[in-house]
Amino acid sequence: MRVTYLAGAIALGVLTLAPSAANARVTRADVDDPTICAIFDAANTWDIETSDIAAKKGSTKEVRDLGAMFSRDHKAVRQQGRDLVKKLHVTPTPPKDFALATDHAQAMKQLESTSGKAFDRAYLTHEVAYHKAVIDAINNSLVPATKNAELKDLEVKVGPAFQAHMLAAQRLLDGMGQ
């Protein structure tokens, strides 16, 4: 299966640092509930990691605060997913071709090697694209492919939070101007 920059919460594909929504498509035939659980966990973990960097390296208080909020929110959502996995006695199974791990490593490398306003722009651009890809994957691929009602409910429940994250990052990015 090829999901490209959309883990845990679901979708990821990095062109420079931004996930590609086109590459984030997951077909129903590609995933089952254990795979969805693994993707859900990875997507949240990876956004925690990028956001932890922003909480430390952001050049403005707004970017640092956004990174801290995103990290906190994704830790809570990841824990909800892990609690559900335990309750359902599911063993998360990462996709066979989990290229997302490579994509995430590239994003982390770029964020770690950037600073100042360039870091802020790279992080915010990444977060907007990442959350767009995740929202697309949740709505168009994961929810339709999910068999378990509780897992589907969790995916649907986190959708508005992903939307809010995307809009918050977009507002800060728009405020940066050119």
Give the positions of each predicted feature:
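His/Met- and acidic-residue-enriched segments that coordinate or traffic transition-metal cofactors
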Residues: V3-G8, L17-Q178
